[in-house]
Amino acid sequence: MQKIRTCLQKTPNALLCALGAVVFLAGFYFLCYRTPLNEVWLPTTMNNDEALYNRQVVSVLTHGGPQGYFGYQESTADIGRYGTWGPLLIWAYALPGLLFGAGVNVVLWCNLLLIAVGVAVFAHCARLNYWQCIALCGALFSIMLPLRSCVSGASEAMHYMLALLIVGTAAACTAAARLAG
């Protein structure tokens, strides 16, 4: 019991990390975009790559597989074939997409969820204290490009989340090795 109490005193618990990540992303979004989230429409045209990616994810959610939408060339493909994202990435977006439903901006909502999970897991695994969490948020806010690409229909949020998970897990393993050795 003492170990748990000491751990909670030194580092925020997972729920606080998740809450902090959500508050940070909401603050970032409203400071940068000043548009209510329910009024966001990302693509400029229906042939935009982000709209095509969204259609692929929606077709996986509604039909169980892609319905022939590719990206980049704004062309169509055979039904059941995956485009440039490939099946792994489409299904990686379709699974959290089940939480949000088959809507117009399902990829945006998945991106926001993925980056929030990445930041929260990194902060928890790296055992950042409150001041370090604030510094992390300040650093992410100052470079801004990774966060801007997460508020989109592109797949960069998945890449950033995976990078944060890998670095956070490596920090946790390093700390555990120091304690054990």
PLM feature spans:
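Transmembrane-helix signature of polytopic, membrane-embedded enzymes
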Residues: 105, 122-143, 177-180
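Hydrophobic transmembrane alpha-helices
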Residues: 58, 93, 97, 119-127, ...
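Alpha-helical transmembrane segments
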Residues: 25-26, 116-120
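Extracytosolic helix-loop segments that constitute the early lumenal/periplasmic catalytic or substrate-binding loops
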Residues: 33-38, 50-80, 88
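Alpha-helical transmembrane signal-anchor/signal-peptide segments
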Residues: 38-45
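Start-transfer (signal-anchor) and selected internal transmembrane alpha helices
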Residues: 1-36, 124, 172
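Membrane-interface starts of transmembrane alpha-helices
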Residues: 12, 102-110, 131-133
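Aromatic- and kink-enriched transmembrane "portal" helix at the membrane-lumen/periplasm boundary
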Residues: 83, 87-90, 104-108, 112-118, ...
